[in-house]
Amino acid sequence: MKVKCLLAVFLIVLIAAEHCQALFFLPSLIGGLISAIKGRRKRELGTQFRPQQKNFMRREIDLERLFAEMPDY
């Protein structure tokens, strides 16, 4: 039943996209449909940004060390 509803929504959006000539939405729509059928959940945004914050902190520390070791001209 869930798959039938998703396919119906997919077909409606497909017709609307073709009518509006918004074909660039179709790859993301197909990917979302596949994810919904497989039952994957979206990742939390917080978990995506935490590693980047660590990288920024590491870079900042490296830059501070670099500037501390540079001679003054």
Curated annotation (Swiss-Prot):
Range of residues in the leader sequence: 1-22
Keywords, sorted A to Z: Amidation, Antibiotic, Antimicrobial, Cleavage on pair of basic residues, Membrane, Secreted, Signal, Target cell membrane, Target membrane, Transmembrane
Tissue specificity: Expressed by the venom gland.
Main location per the UniProt record: secreted
UniProt keyword annotation of Membrane present: yes
Keyword Glycosyltransferase assigned: no
Subcellular location per the Swiss-Prot or TrEMBL entry: Secreted; Target cell membrane
GO cellular component, one term: membrane
Its job: Cationic host defense peptide that have antibacterial activity by breaking membranes. Is more effective on Gram-positive than on Gram-negative bacteria.
Protein name in UniProt: Antimicrobial peptide 143
